[in-house]
């Protein structure tokens, strides 16, 4: 039930291990920190990490007459979360499902969750281009979707997979809002200098080639890693960090596209 959702943003990645779920989670927290009501939907059925990243493991979801009730992280209901991780008894339990069952579950997530009034719904998808992605895109035809943010890393192999993701978006008719290059350098925890430990500028070159915006480059920052397992936003806890600056810029970019006001 997305009738109360103003904007839907899909977060994609060409391959696993690029930090897509971390970017999705921190983007949702950044949007909330700037005054928006946000939903975060984790449809990575085989590797749901959002409950862990937000410290929500062990929470139970319930059904009401209108569908599943998402997990709220605060009494004001400014951040609502839904993930298959809440349906698993143990985080280490594998999800061994064939395609049709995965498709059915994703459709349920997109149609049977009772989202309240939301400014943004962030959808964290599995890596690659699979049945799950096709299901999401088919469901999005019935609901206005603003577009996709693609997360990559500077390495060549990751960029090759992003090219496939861009082609997928083009063929399925979803607009690419921009590219985020994650793990772009390492921030020293002692002096705060950033050192490029992988290739550099790959995300910028790919964005230029695809003629889409480069939304920002996020470094590996150990201080950000410490926030995992909580609902603390980088914008509040590390306000002067380069990660916070990039996330703030992405929020402003999205608000500019959707004409939603951002609070200070």
UniProtKB/Swiss-Prot annotation:
Location within or outside the cell: Cytoplasm
Transmembrane segments: none
One biological process term in Gene Ontology: iron-sulfur cluster assembly
Residues holding [4Fe-4S] cluster: 188, 191
CC cofactor note: Binds 4 [4Fe-4S] clusters per heterotetramer. Contains two stable clusters in the N-termini of Nubp1 and two labile, bridging clusters between subunits of the Nubp1-Nubp2 heterotetramer.
Cofactor(s) needed by this chain: [4Fe-4S] cluster
Swiss-Prot/TrEMBL keywords: 4Fe-4S, ATP-binding, Cytoplasm, Iron, Iron-sulfur, Metal-binding, Nucleotide-binding
Oligomer and partners: Heterotetramer of 2 Nubp1 and 2 Nubp2 chains.
Family: Belongs to the Mrp/NBP35 ATP-binding proteins family. NUBP2/CFD1 subfamily.
Name by which UniProt lists this protein: Cytosolic Fe-S cluster assembly factor Nubp2 homolog
Species in which this protein is naturally found: Drosophila mojavensis (Fruit fly)
Gene that this sequence comes from: Nubp2
């Amino acid at each position: 039930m997305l009738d109360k959702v103003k904007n839907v943003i899909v977060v994609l990645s060409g391959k696993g291990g690029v930090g897509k779920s971390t970017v999705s989670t921190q983007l949702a927290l950044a949007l909330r920190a700037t005054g928006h009501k946000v939903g975060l939907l984790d449809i990575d059925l085989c590797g749901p990490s959002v409950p862990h990243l937000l410290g929500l493991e062990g929470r139970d979801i319930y059904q009401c007459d209108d569908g599943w009730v998402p997990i709220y992280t605060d009494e004001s209901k400014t951040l609502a979360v839904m993930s298959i991780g809440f349906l698993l008894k143990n985080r280490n339990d594998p999800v061994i499902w064939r395609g049709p069952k995965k498709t059915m579950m994703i459709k349920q997530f997109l149609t049977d969750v009772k989202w309240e009034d939301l400014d943004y719904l962030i959808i964290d998808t599995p890596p690659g281009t699979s049945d799950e992605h096709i299901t999401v895109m088919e469901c999005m035809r019935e609901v206005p979707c603003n577009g996709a943010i693609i997360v990559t890393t500077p390495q060549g192999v990751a960029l090759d997979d992003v090219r496939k993701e861009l082609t997928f978006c083009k063929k399925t008719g979803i607009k690419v809002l921009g590219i985020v290059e994650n793990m772009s350098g390492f921030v020293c925890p002692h002096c705060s200098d950033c050192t490029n430990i992988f290739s550099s500028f790959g995300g910028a070159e790919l964005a230029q080639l695809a003629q889409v915006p480069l939304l920002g480059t996020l470094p590996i920052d150990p201080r950000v890693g410490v926030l995992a397992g909580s609902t603390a936003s980088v914008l509040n806890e590390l306000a002067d960090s380069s990660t916070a600056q990039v996330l703030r810029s992405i929020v402003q970019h999205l608000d500019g596209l959707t004409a939603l006001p951002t609070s200070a």
